[in-house]
Swiss-Prot record:
It is a multi-pass membrane protein. It comes from Nitrosomonas eutropha (strain DSM 101675 / C91 / Nm57). Its EC number is 7.1.1.-. Its main location: membrane. Keywords: Cell inner membrane, Cell membrane, Membrane, NAD, Quinone, Translocase, Transmembrane, Transmembrane helix, Ubiquinone. NDH-1 shuttles electrons from NADH, via FMN and iron-sulfur (Fe-S) centers, to quinones in the respiratory chain. The immediate electron acceptor for the enzyme in this species is believed to be ubiquinone. Couples the redox reaction to proton translocation (for every two electrons transferred, four hydrogen ions are translocated across the cytoplasmic membrane), and thus conserves the redox energy in a proton gradient. This subunit may bind ubiquinone. HAMAP family: NDH1_NuoH (MF_01350). It is found in: Cell inner membrane. It catalyses: a quinone + NADH + 5 H(+)(in) = a quinol + NAD(+) + 4 H(+)(out). This is NADH-quinone oxidoreductase subunit H. The chain crosses the membrane at residues 27-47, 99-119, 133-153, 168-188, 206-226, 268-288, 294-314, 329-349. The gene is nuoH. InterPro entries: NADH_UbQ_OxRdtase_su1/FPO, NADH_UbQ_OxRdtase_su1_CS. GO terms for biological process: aerobic respiration.
């Protein structure tokens, strides 16, 4: 791609050419992330419907196909759903704040997409390789709740407002638990750079992955990620049987679809971060032939798919928790466990070098 830089310099001059080339390069890299992500979101909805249908002994979507090919039945369903959503009218309720009503979906989707700027798919395949990547992701994922709160308030509906308040309290509660769980990863890797975190898990086998010594933190992080994305069994922000549809009860058409995209993009982000920080990222489970011949991106995508399967499995299996049960789990279970684990991990890391070299501590320190 850098071979096009002289062409830009010839067309626009030395100074402008370099600036325009860098701008075009970054825009192409952004599109190279966003377009596959949106396709992944679309087909994650298809996978969800097929997997849950299988668990409930149903068929699932099997009609919409490409070019009439029978064995592709159902694979065109996400495209059909997207076209239908685009063609639907966006109805703004009477008494709603029109500007904020339309701004809320944008505020929800923007952080969900912006967080991917620092996510590495391999040592070379990353848009922005910054040293504070983990801090940046925590900041971006925290901003998504503003779109939900504004949507609930701008709708001028008590059901939407209740859903927004539930979502805000839930995100604040589980954001703390997620942050404390990631502090343990930071302590073990001594870095906020996601590439360095993966490099710290190298060692020849899955026994060096942070999931082994930090297994309780892995569970806390993943369950908190499910709660933060408002997925079952933590979907009290929507709560169809309680508050109709929560914060997006009055949304329709593309505005509703953007909320939908943000939720599924956040699901993929949580699964990706769990794979990078606890499951070795793009590292193979065993560094021997034939495992190390498979590209690292394939290993990362496989781990992400496994994590996403658990998201879908939870939806088909568990009933919705009550709101008070969700708050109790976050504040009285997860946060105390993470704080205790941080203290224990810090104490272990202060042991003498001889103790750290004994089995099994020598696997992890």
């Amino acid at each position: 791609m850098d071979s096009f830089q002289p062409l830009f310099e010839q067309l626009f001059g030395s100074e402008w050419g370099v600036s325009l080339f860098l701008l075009a390069k970054n825009l192409l890299l952004i599109l190279a992330i966003i377009i596959p992500l949106l396709l992944a979101v679309a087909y994650l909805t298809f996978a969800e419907r097929k997997i849950i249908a299988f668990m409930q002994v149903r068929v699932g979507p099997n009609r919409v196909t490409f070019f009439g090919i029978p064995w592709l039945g159902g694979w065109g369903q996400p495209i059909a759903d997207a076209v239908k959503a685009i063609m639907k009218e966006i109805i703004i309720p009477t008494g709603a704040n029109k500007f904020l009503f339309l701004l809320a979906p944008i505020l929800a989707i923007t952080p969900a997409l912006a967080a991917w700027a620092v996510v590495p798919f391999s040592p070379e395949l990353v848009l922005a390789d910054i040293n504070a990547a983990l801090l940046y992701i925590l900041a971006m994922t925290s901003l998504g709740v503003y779109g939900v709160i504004i949507a609930g308030w701008a709708s001028n509906s008590k059901y939407a407002f209740l859903g927004a308040m539930r979502s805000a309290a839930q995100v604040i509660s589980y954001e703390l638990a997620m942050g404390f769980a990631l502090v343990c990863v930071l302590m073990m890797s001594s870095s906020l750079n996601l590439g360095d975190i993966v490099a710290g898990q190298q060692g020849g086998s899955f026994l060096n992955w942070y999931m082994i010594p930090l297994f309780p933190m892995f569970l806390v992080y993943f369950i908190s990620g499910v709660a933060e994305t408002n997925r079952l069994p933590f979907d009290v922000a929507e709560g169809e049987s309680e508050i109709v549809a929560g914060f997006h009860v009055d949304y329709s058409g593309m505005a509703f679809t953007i909320f939908f995209l943000a939720e599924y993009a956040n699901m993929i982000l949580v699964a990706t971060l769990a794979s990078i920080m606890f499951l070795g990222g793009w590292l193979p489970p065993v560094d021997i032939i034939p495992f190390n011949l498979i590209p690292g991106v394939v290993w990362l995508l496989l781990k992400i798919a496994i994590m996403l399967f658990f998201f879908l499995w939870f939806r088909a299996t568990f009933p919705r928790y009550r709101y008070d049960q969700i708050m109790r789990l976050g504040w009285k279970v997860f946060i105390p466990i993470t704080l205790i684990w941080i203290v224990l991990l810090g104490a272990v890391m202060q042991l003498p070098e001889a103790a750290l070299q004994s089995f099994p501590l020598n696997l992890w320190f």
